[in-house]
Amino acid sequence: RALHHLPRIQARNLHGDRLAGNRFAYALFDAGEIRITDLSDPWAPKTQRFPAGKQPYDALVTPDGRYYIAGLFGEDGLALLDTWQPEQGTRKILSGYGRGQEPLPVFKMPHLRGWAIAGGRAYLPAIGRHEVLVVDTGTWQEVGRIPVKSQPVFVMARPDGRQIWVNFAFPDYSEVQVIDTLSGKVVKTLSPGKA
């Protein structure tokens, strides 16, 4: 079967994840949208569009598949879409988390797949800051900040969720810090070499 019968879907600057039920969620940087395309019938895909904010990039789907979260390159904050209730549309979370502070230059944009979710909390890199943000995944409200050595890029959980490992952008890309999730403090700094 030829695929030329399928409708064209803009794919430039697309960042997506597979959802349950042959659905695919993706963010369109240029269009400022999050879309969910249901491919249950590959000959008649159905696409839902949701305004997301300025320049959505990259994304994360929570481990339970419920929430799709896109970063917003053009503004502080993130766009959250409940994929179990998409008719509610997107909502902004962590809006203005950098407001009132002088941001640092950004050397590397963090990837949302490089976030950690452990123990009902999301740990994410604060863009242009020397911090890891801690967010309650029940409310999607910020509940803390953990100071780290430099600008974090990837924030990954140990499989049991007891520790979070953080690597950094230039010039500190040769170091990794380990955060204890109970205390919310850096407990070790490793120097494995340039990444």
Tell me the role of every PLM-derived stretch.
Residues 1-195:
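Predominantly soluble domains enriched in secretory-pathway, periplasmic, or organellar proteins
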